Amino acid sequence: MTRRELARMIDHTLLKPDATEAQIRQLCAEGREHGFMSVCVNPYWVPLCAELLSGTEVKVCTTIGFPLGANRSEIKAVEAEDAVARGAREVDMVINVGALKSGRRDVVLNDIRAVVSAVAGEALVKVIIETGLLTDEEKVIACQLAQEAGADFVKTSTGFGTGGATVHDIALMRRTVGAGMGVKASGGVRDLETALAMIGAGANRIGASAGVAILAGLEA
């Protein structure tokens, strides 16, 4: 795998609540320098990132219903619509985990559909299923619902919950959605070895705050 190929699989991420403007600017500078697929930031920072990355191939990615996923679908839809209007081209939404664990598949399906509809094809939708809170059976159901709702990716974790991406979960998610949907590994991917293990298991996108370090490992 070439350096560019790996960089184009990474969402260079900074979602800490105390992230400063200087840190966001640095994130975007690194995004430009290394050619990451996107920078992933909280919604407040979307306009600044869109301005800083204008004219580059680096997309702006943001979060919806983050990190708990427990808001109403209508609110998530408004968040998504606003994010796209301000320059986001990828949105990572959190499912309603409690509804899933309550057996309310209809709620989860409609929740995802609301966001897919809100972006109206102007942004990719990644669905965070928060694997650390789910049984394997629930992970499969969540992936099936995301696929049925028309999302583009399923994603392991917010990074704010228990656990993160594992090879087991990535392989399970890939088997569930097949080749036609993206799988994003996020949470605890901090080095090249882990990133390559996730890719080997079926991930075609990596969410990481350590994107620069991951690429450096390829050059070592």
UniProtKB/Swiss-Prot annotation:
GO MF annotation list: deoxyribose-phosphate aldolase activity
UniProt keyword annotation of Lyase present: yes
SMART domains the UniProt entry points to: DeoC
Catalytic activity: 2-deoxy-D-ribose 5-phosphate = D-glyceraldehyde 3-phosphate + acetaldehyde
Associated pathway: Carbohydrate degradation; 2-deoxy-D-ribose 1-phosphate degradation; D-glyceraldehyde 3-phosphate and acetaldehyde from 2-deoxy-alpha-D-ribose 1-phosphate: step 2/2
Residues forming the catalytic site: D92, K155, K184
Entry-linked InterPro entries: Aldolase_TIM, DeoC, DeoC/FbaB/LacD_aldolase, DeoC_typeI
Keywords, in A-Z order: Cytoplasm, Lyase, Schiff base
Keyword Cytoplasm: yes
Subcellular location as annotated: Cytoplasm
GO biological process, one term: 2-deoxyribose 1-phosphate catabolic process
Transmembrane annotation, as ranges: none
Gene Ontology cellular component list: cytoplasm
Source organism, top-level taxon: Bacteria
Enzyme class: lyase
Biological function: Catalyzes a reversible aldol reaction between acetaldehyde and D-glyceraldehyde 3-phosphate to generate 2-deoxy-D-ribose 5-phosphate.
PANTHER family in alphabetical order: DEOXYRIBOSE-PHOSPHATE ALDOLASE (PTHR10889:SF1)
Alphabetized HAMAP family for the sequence: DeoC_type1 (MF_00114)
Entry's family note: Belongs to the DeoC/FbaB aldolase family. DeoC type 1 subfamily.
Name used for this protein in its record: Deoxyribose-phosphate aldolase
